[in-house]
Amino acid sequence: RSRRQRQMCIRDSSDIEKTGDFHCSNKKVNQLQSNITWSQRDNFLDIPTDCPQRDERLGWTGDAQVFSWTAAFNRNTALFYKKWMRDVAAESSLEKGVPHVVPDILDSYSSSAWSDVAVIVPWVVYQIYGDKGILEENWKCMHEWVDYIKNNCGENGLWQSGFQYGDWLALDKEESADRTGATDKYMIANAYYLYV
């Protein structure tokens, strides 16, 4: 006979004030929103990490930028992102661009969507909270990122070189080793270039 042991689990995350909520008449949509808010709490511990279900838990910049609007709806992320964007700026340069992960433990740099975090997250914080300070503080990094793209464009003005994640992990492509979707990765890169 085995004894039942009492186990205690402590949830840890950055203390970020709840600011938004969503409810509707559909139980499944409400459950989805609940899952989103819990995932945010589980993944926001000093840096925005990517996956609670794996042991990777890195500060992937693509995940952070694509989730930034939702994160700002759910919680007051202004100070959280302000601190993390300092980390992003410290790891970035005109020569290398912006890392895919911050803190940069992979030494991988400069692809659309991921590196666009340098522009998108400060813009989200400004749009949601009216904080011009985050734009001023990150202006150099923002400009250097856009200049990096411009410097890597061809004569036609399009960004068609270097590594790109493309539509990462999309399921609309025949089996391949590169894990990108069927959408042309440079089309996605140029769409983001226009956006930033």
Language model: regions and residue ranges:
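Active-site acid/base region of carbohydrate-active enzymes
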Residues: 11-35, 41-42, 48-100, 109, ...
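Single conserved hydrophobic/aromatic residue that forms the stacking wall/gate
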Residues: 1-10
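Hydrophobic alpha-helical segments typical of transmembrane helices
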Residues: 84, 121-122
